[in-house]
């Protein structure tokens, strides 16, 4: 393994040790892993951004697209670390000016996202970031919006992944998660 991969793995291990677990949240049978404690400690927040920056390496990234709302927590900071712009993907009616809109399927129904039409130039290289990859519906929707702008999706980045939901199967660009989440549902 390269030194870079070893460093990312060490950072991921330390970050994962700082998660809090909540059994049966938000519903029975789910073990919720809360990554918000990372943001209460500046050294951990810096390590989260460093791990993603190390992963991206020397790839040229023009924009980081963050999903509402947890993609907003680290997306702008990662964009700054990569010398890239940050572009939010939001629920309908939250962005001024002309927007592209997409409807996507989630675990329990459908939802919509929007992105401003004129903020990403055609051919720009983008990362799409969010906290958790679950069913892949939200990330898929953001990817469809990125395509409408003419951007090239370099990769989807997530802090965690609920592997058993197979959300990465819905995405048509490489997927990277700092650490995998649950492989199956929680049972007591």
Swiss-Prot record:
GO biological process, one term: AMP salvage
Reported cofactor(s): Mg(2+)
Enzyme class per UniProt: transferase
Record pathway: Purine metabolism; AMP biosynthesis via salvage pathway; AMP from adenine: step 1/1
Enzyme Commission numbers on file: 2.4.2.7
Keywords, sorted A to Z: Cytoplasm, Glycosyltransferase, Magnesium, Metal-binding, Nucleus, Purine salvage, Transferase
Subcellular compartments: Cytoplasm; Nucleus
Residue sites binding AMP per the record: 134-138
Superkingdom, taxonomy of origin: Eukaryota
GO cellular component, one term: cytoplasm
UniProt GO molecular function: adenine binding; adenine phosphoribosyltransferase activity; AMP binding; metal ion binding
Stated role: Catalyzes a salvage reaction resulting in the formation of AMP, that is energically less costly than de novo synthesis.
Entry's family note: Belongs to the purine/pyrimidine phosphoribosyltransferase family.
Subunit structure: Homodimer.
Protein name (database record): Adenine phosphoribosyltransferase
Natural source organism: Candida albicans (strain SC5314 / ATCC MYA-2876)
